Amino acid sequence: MPTARLIEEGGIVYVQFGDQRLRLADEDAACLRPPPAARPGVETAVPAELAAAIESARTFRDMLMQLPQVVSVRGGYRFQDGRITQTPAVVVAVERKLEGLAPAQQIPDVLPDGTPTDVTVADPVERLEAQGVTSARVSRPPLLIDQIQAAAPEAEGLEAVPVITYEPPSGASLAPVTGPMAITCHVSPDAGWSVLRPFLEEAHQEVTLGMYDFTAPHIYQAVRSLLRDSDVLWRQTLGPNESLPGSDDIDSTKANDKPEADIILGLSRVAKERFESTFAHVGAGKTFASAYHIKVAIRDAAATWLSSGNWQSSNQPAIDLLDPAADRKLIPLYNREWHAVIESPELADTFRRYLRHDFETAEQTPEVGLEVAPAALPDLLVPVDELLEEERGAVGLEVFPPARFAFGARDPLTVQPILTPDNYLDVVLDLLRKRPNERLYFQNQSLNPVKEPTPAWAELLRLLVEYSNDEALDVRIIFRNIGPIRNKLESLQAAGFNMDRIRVQKGCHTKGIVIDSATVLLGSHNWTNQGVEANRDASLLIDHPEIAGYYERVFLHDWDHLARAAIREEAMPIPVIPGQETAGAEAVAFRRVPWSAWMEE
């Protein structure tokens, strides 16, 4: 059965069902938001020197592709000792670097037009494309360095913000909440579970959950016990995807995680009619663009747990790193997450209204037709030595216990609730338009400039670029070392960032900003065009030096001990191509992981 979808042509919105097309009335089309990305407000300019390298790559591509092991040729920047330089170059990706080649088979250091080359190890997508395996599901995330040299049809739609059907709940407000409250600041892997567990166990009436992934067995057991031993009502909306390791990935931090179908079945058996679960609708023409990415739980309409991290063992490990005997070398294996528990009935009621609306929307708006099951993604082989390198290098790591701050009627705290697609752009643009006085610390899983950003996304990036180049400011940026990391760094340089102020961190899943040691933004918003505009995410903005200082200390620790200015390109994963599976010695030298372990969540 074909699937209905929304499309736009010539400013007119249609419902496409198979080969049939129905035009929407203008008043119906007008309520669909955000505006289609077919009308971008800004096109990122390409630096002239980089444009010359891109042209050189086009000119000499055929010649270079004839050389041994070469799988792709493009324009980009040279790297030296794993660090990006400002020198544009023709980047030649190879399956592996070979020694002792005859001169005629070697990649020249400089091309006939004077452009230098830089040889790198091909990423999994480049390897698959060289094997003739092409699929939208195995493509890279939309990145500026790729888009500015892609053929027109290939570039169209990359990181487009699609038409969505989201409408906020009637009568709800995201106004700042001011009053007596308490906030418990904490982070993972240090103390995430030690705070989340009692938060759940202290429920007496109901829990309302919005969550991207729920697979951790210890969280399941805690919820199961709660529902078995009480009359608590549980209502949850989940994202429609899950990320689990392969059965033979014994070293995965999620090796014992459960499929969400099993989680739902088990909780249904215990709580019966007291348990309700649904999946949000994501995709073009649906409620949210590409992800129900929120991580919020409301307990008894009185307390809110809000986080950057999912309910997976990689985000919420069942370990006590505050124990002096704990093995702190395990810290880099887990995700860095920022969490907060806020005891405020008013704030809890605000988020609860939106989460209940998400649930009702998913339940009352059935999918039209059945989606075809997507093709399975290939697994990846990751060098074991690279993974051990992270553990061996984990020296001098600190752990951070939770910190609780209480506020009364005489000294109330103000908290700004933030949701996408609702008010993130309004709040965060207003925040960043005010130049910091001294410092800005940015830590996020994603930081992905694109060729044709929407106007608001373009302004967010422009402001961060501007501050990164302001010598009077202490600006530091950390994002996750995952996926095509070289292409990401090249995209940031092409967008104008000061690369001396950027580091990458394994397992960085935080989405936070600290400004002037006084203001903190934390939550689940990835810095992508869809992440700030059209997915479902939640964050908080708080002006308070002690609260901001807590997260700032964690940031500075990560900057000094876990983040790196250089990357290790030789550690690039290798895709397991169907029919070419490996065994034997490679099972010892490599760890087999799912494709999702290489891509952003």
Protein language model regions, located:
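Terminal presequence/propeptide segments associated with secretion/organelle targeting
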Residues: M1-A160, T165, S170
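Short, conserved charged micro-motifs
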Residues: L98-Q106, A348-T350, A548-Y550
